């Protein structure tokens, strides 16, 4: 029995004009990619891997999608996606986030990438709190006077008790 080897390409669609961007969907992506591959690489190349081309996952909020293609043709698809520069006059760019042999590897890569982005949002929240800004339930920004007391260390013995506090600084 022959094992079919596939590659899963996790790709991000970057719209350079957000006002003219389109909502991603399975059918739109499949049609658009099919037409662009025919135009960029030729109909013969497209026909060679058309049967193995499948959209596995689409997230319109993050503009991320996972596409499956046969191992033999994943470099051709990667090349075609790289060559796409516009969608009806709107500048567009496909960024290859991860190439893997299974969906599980793509999921792990997505968790790793989005985990870093989530920590950036937490950092912004911390910076807002340091400035004394708060956001209420209606997403209104309120500025409160920030009171920073440096004398807390002096009350607790100055924080100079000879112990290293590096264990508290771990990520």
From Swiss-Prot:
It catalyses: Endonucleolytic cleavage of RNA, removing 5'-extranucleotides from tRNA precursor. Residues 151-171 have a biased composition (Acidic residues). Residues 131-171 are annotated as: Disordered. GO terms for biological process: tRNA 5'-leader removal. Keywords: Hydrolase, Nucleus, tRNA processing. It is found in: Nucleus, Nucleolus. Coiled coil: none annotated. Belongs to the eukaryotic/archaeal RNase P protein component 2 family. This is Probable ribonuclease P/MRP protein subunit POP5. It comes from Dictyostelium discoideum.
């Amino acid at each position: 029995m022959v094992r079919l080897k596939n590659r899963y390409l996790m790709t991000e669609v970057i719209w350079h004009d957000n006002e003219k961007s389109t909502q991603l969907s399975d059918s739109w992506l499949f049609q658009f990619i099919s037409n662009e591959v025919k135009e960029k690489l030729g109909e013969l190349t497209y026909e060679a891997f058309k049967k193995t081309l499948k959209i596995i996952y689409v997230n319109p909020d993050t503009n991320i999608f996972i596409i499956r293609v046969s191992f033999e043709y994943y470099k051709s698809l990667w090349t075609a996606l790289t060559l796409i520069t516009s969608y009806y006059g709107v500048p567009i760019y496909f960024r290859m986030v991860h190439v893997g042999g299974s969906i599980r590897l793509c999921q792990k890569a997505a968790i790793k990438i989005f985990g870093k982005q989530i920590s950036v949002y937490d950092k912004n929240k911390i910076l807002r709190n340091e400035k004394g800004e708060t956001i209420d339930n209606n997403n209104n920004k309120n500025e409160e006077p920030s009171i920073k007391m440096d004398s807390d260390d002096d009350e607790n013995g100055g924080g100079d008790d000879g112990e290293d506090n590096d264990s508290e600084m771990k990520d």
